[in-house]
Amino acid sequence: MEYEAKKGKKGFVSPIRRLVFPKAARQAAFRSSVSRRPLHSMPLYPPDYLIDPHILLCDYLEKEVKFLGHLTWVTSSLNPSSRDELLQLLDTARQLKELPLKTTPEQDSILSLSARCLLLTWRDNEELILRIPTHEIAAASYLQDDALHLLVLKTGLGVDPVPAGMDGSPGGSGRDPGPPGAAPEKRRVGTAERRHTICSLDWRVAWGGGAGAEARAAGGGGSLERQRAGARASGSWERRQTFSGSWERRHAGGGAGKPGGSWERRQASGGVGGSWERRHPGPNPLDPQNHSPDAYCNLVILAVANRDAAEESCALICQVFQIIYGDQSIECVDRAGYHYRSTPKRPWLSSCTMAPRTHLKRATVAHPHRLSTAPTAAVSTTAAGPSSSYRITWSRCGVSWVLLRSSSLHCCYETIVWGCLSRTTVQVCRNSMGTDGSSFSLECGPSSQIRTSATSRASWRVWVSARAESSLTALAASSAA
């Protein structure tokens, strides 16, 4: 009985305790007791904040930010580089109570970047907030509003919020965080890796096993919020509404009888599916050249520590974009107004400025070695001729050759990022090496190899054997003398 009486007084706090220890201090003490894991990150250096593209292709990078809100009613004609437009939009969102007036530690989140997508998760329980596919990114801009350093991401309509605590992705926790005083469960190993290997649409399809498939069979399709219309989801303003997503879904007049969704779904008379271009051969109202007021995009508002952190995040997002669209740039290509996406042309970077600035260490091999490179290797070799020798170095920035005084033979291997070679530099090297009759060919691609013809190999063996015989003759003559 005594235990039951004490249990009933659990929520009581004495007035003296309230005066001496305010609520904010008690919450800070509780937050400090929850340990946070170190981020999966690496140091990057200004002004370019360059990173090895293979890290973004095969791995991911995490940055700590504050998630302020996700606006879904923004027109696609918004200029993300205009400070006045962004400030006016942020003030309107604050008046509508869709953005907070100040930042709190509860807004701490993790921005995880990879070549496939951008992930936003809460810092403490690491529940998934947003998944933004790379092809949906339109622009990333930095904005300073009073003391806040804001990172604004303009994305397309293919971004759906995920209710907190209901992450059912194959690698998400999918569990209830429990009462506030309970200790959080240990994070599963490899969660972020599995989240980065699937896109947003694939995740929603993969999640639909068991209860999800039954819900869709009962007629509840769409995102998770629309399937769970009766439950109240915590988190941002959009996740607390009955219907999340674009502005039309939440403000479509006519109630449940009128289908919400994008402009194409509301304007489709025959009720057939598919994109707008297949049903209407005329001009596209989502074209930025002649856009329609009904075309909308999403804005993700993040707060960072300082200007350097914002510039680093913008640079990383630009590099993520250029990995997929190597011949285009995120600043001049706005994809938020399109429902269709162009096919990635090159999965590798085409600019030499994207290479990591790494100090190269050379290893000299004393014996001849057959030269072959992997996608992440570059080779430097010295080809000796009858009268002189040339050193040809091919790397990510091209091919260069220099005249050497001594006719030595050695091979040097350097581990840097592979890149394509220009035909001009290859032709110059071929012409310069044509003095002794040798020939070679270079090919650009992930499976590139450096091959020498049979004629050049035969002449090279003859020259090496003659050089060895002359060395032995000179050695014998010197010993005899």
Swiss-Prot record:
CDD domains the UniProt entry points to: PTB_CCM2
List GO BP terms, alphabetically: cardiac atrium morphogenesis; cardiac muscle tissue growth; homotypic cell-cell adhesion; negative regulation of homotypic cell-cell adhesion; positive regulation of fibroblast growth factor production; ventricular trabecula myocardium morphogenesis; wound healing
Where are the stretches annotated Disordered?
A: 161-193, 214-290
InterPro entries in the cross-refs: Malcavernin, PH-like_dom_sf
Q: Where is the composition biased (Gly residues)?
A: 214-223
**In this entry, which stretches build a coiled coil?**
none
Please, which domain of life does this record's source organism belong to?
A: Eukaryota
Basic and acidic residues bias located where? Answer: 184-193, 237-251
User: What family classification does the UniProt entry report for this protein?
Assistant: Belongs to the CCM2 family.
Name this polypeptide is given: Cerebral cavernous malformations 2 protein-like
- Organism name: Mus musculus
